[in-house]
Amino acid sequence: SVISNLLPIGISDALMVSSAQKILVTNLVSNRNQTHHFTPDRYLKVFRKYTHTEFPFNILICPNLSQNSFEKRYPHIAKSYALEHAHFLGWTVNELDAVSRKGIKIESSDIISITPHLNRLRHDPQKLARVFKKIIG
């Protein structure tokens, strides 16, 4: 969990005073005990709680597929994760807009890759690099 990295003394203060871009790359798949049914707004609320800051991140990078779209495109992978009580974390335009209206920039992009063995979802490093280059310039 990334939350434990935010708990040491001084991290919240550093986040508040830093002028750096603070970027959150969301999970691709829910974790039953951590991010099950998380929305972008829920991410923001949890990060606010543990950092005690209004804007613990100002950019959110997430997949460009909603959960429904993913399940239609990759039904065999969705079923495999469902057997583990997990699901793809992709969101609707309305769910993303809810966070955007709070001042968080949304970068919804093709950032996933599927492993050839076992059909597992991973953040694709090359795809993420393109998104980071776009953000950072």
Regions inferred by a protein language model and the residue ranges of each:
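Short, catalytically relevant binding-site loops at active-site mouths
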Residues: 1, 29-33, 66-67, 114
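Short, mixed-charge, low-aromatic patches
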Residues: 1-5, 86
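Charged helix-capping and loop-helix junction motifs
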Residues: 4-12, 38-43
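A generic local secondary-structure boundary/capping motif
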Residues: 11-14, 49
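A short helix->loop->beta-strand "cap" motif at the edges of active sites that frequently abuts
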Residues: 18-22, 104
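Generic beta-sheet signal
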Residues: 25-27, 62
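C-terminal functional extensions of proteins
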Residues: 37-137
